[in-house]
């Protein structure tokens, strides 16, 4: 193996006739030789350590490929193999479908889409159309089953099938008990209100009765006193059945009182007249004057 200088980025690499990787850069002093020194004129910046040394490519003849074996279109599908081709547009390439790994991909669509300006309509195989339908059925079946987890970590989750709404919906509760309870409450409240109202009315009535009874007793006492005052004036009480005196009514007592008062006024007037005559016949020395008119008046 021949060692040469490390080429830089501008160095061109070619294959010669005997299949060896040869550097076209002219040879310079070898930095690893024994007579190398720091004083030697070496362009250290021209060395590129990233590029390897030239090495021979010893490839056997049976591994060499004949250009006739390569097809004219590298990206075209083989003629004897027919697979499932699915179009991959710009939107489908960014799709996040996690279950489309088993669907084949045809590279011919990419090459044809780049070469032609108007791509053909994508063809979808029946297998690819059946797959999403079956997956949708399985997902709907999984959603129909409700998984119930237990609060205890030792118990495993149990799956219970979700029954139909008609079977699980309970029968409507009867409305009569709440209505009866509300009616009872209303009746109780009404009864309590009526009881309180009747109690208040009874208290007012009792107080009024007490006041009225006291007034009647006082009035009766006044009428009795008036009746007793008129008994000495000659006013007789009417008899009831002729058996004896009976109590007068209030109206009769008032009538007798009016007559008695009139009689008293007449007597008072006669007395005042007599007093005036006596004053006229009385002398200043206390002597009484005798005349015929006074004698007639006395008689």
Curated annotation (Swiss-Prot):
Taxonomic lineage from the root: Eukaryota, Fungi, Dikarya, Ascomycota, Pezizomycotina
GO molecular function, one term: protein dimerization activity
Leader sequence residues: none
Disulfide bonds: none
Keywords: Coiled coil, Nucleus, Transcription, Transcription regulation
Stimuli inducing this protein: Expression is positively regulated by the transcription factor srbA.
GO CC annotation: chromatin; nucleus
UniProt superkingdom: Eukaryota
Keyword Coiled coil (UniProt): yes
Region Disordered, residue ranges: 1-33, 81-204
Organism: Aspergillus fumigatus (strain ATCC MYA-4609 / CBS 101355 / FGSC A1100 / Af293)
Coiled coil ranges: 254-281
Pfam family name, one: HLH
Biased composition (Low complexity): 161-170
PROSITE patterns: BHLH (PS50888)
Disruption phenotype: Impairs growth in a hypoxic environment and subsequent virulence.
Annotated SMART domains: HLH
Main location: nucleus
Gene Ontology BP terms: cellular response to hypoxia; positive regulation of transcription by RNA polymerase II
UniProt key word Coiled coil: yes
Sequence ranges assigned to domain bHLH in this UniProt record: 203-264
Region (Helix-loop-helix motif), start-end ranges: 217-264
Region of interest: Basic motif: 203-216
Protein name listed in UniProt: Transcription factor srbB
Protein localization: Nucleus
Protein purpose: Key transcription factors critical for hypoxia adaptation and virulence. Plays a major role in regulation of heme biosynthesis and carbohydrate metabolism early in the response to hypoxia.
UniProt cross-references to Gene3D superfamilies, sorted A to Z: Helix-loop-helix DNA-binding domain
InterPro entries associated with the record: bHLH_dom, HLH_DNA-bd_sf, Regulatory_TF_Diverse
């Amino acid at each position: 193996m021949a060692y040469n200088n490390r080429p830089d980025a501008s160095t061109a690499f070619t294959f010669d006739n005997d299949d060896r990787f040869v550097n076209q850069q002219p040879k310079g002093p070898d930095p690893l030789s024994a007579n190398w020194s720091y004083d030697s004129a070496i362009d250290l910046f021209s060395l590129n350590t990233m590029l390897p040394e030239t090495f021979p490519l010893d490839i056997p003849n049976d591994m060499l490929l004949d250009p006739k074996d390569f097809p004219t279109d590298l990206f075209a599908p083989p003629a004897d193999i027919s697979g499932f081709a699915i179009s991959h547009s710009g939107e489908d390439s960014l799709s996040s479908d996690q279950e489309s790994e088993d669907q084949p991909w045809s590279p011919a669509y990419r090459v044809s889409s780049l070469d032609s300006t108007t791509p053909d309509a994508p063809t979808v195989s029946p297998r690819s159309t059946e797959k999403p339908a079956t997956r949708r059925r399985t997902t709907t079946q999984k959603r129909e089953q409700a998984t119930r987890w237990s609060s205890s970590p030792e118990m495993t989750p149990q799956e219970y099938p979700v029954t139909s709404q008609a079977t699980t919906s309970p029968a409507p509760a009867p409305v009569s008990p709440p209505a009866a309870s509300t009616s009872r409450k209303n009746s109780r409240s009404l009864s309590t209100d009526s009881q309180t109202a009747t109690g208040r009315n009874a208290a007012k009535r009792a107080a009024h009765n007490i006041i009225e009874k006291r007034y009647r007793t006082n009035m009766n006492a006044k009428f009795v006193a008036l009746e007793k005052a008129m008994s000495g004036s000659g006013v007789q009480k009417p008899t009831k059945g002729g058996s004896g005196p009976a109590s007068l009514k209030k109206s009769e007592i008032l009538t007798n009182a009016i007559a008695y008062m009139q009689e008293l006024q007449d007597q008072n007037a006669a007395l005042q007249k007599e007093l005036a005559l006596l004053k006229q016949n009385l002398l200043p020395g206390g002597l009484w004057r005798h005349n015929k008119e006074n004698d007639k008046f006395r008689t």
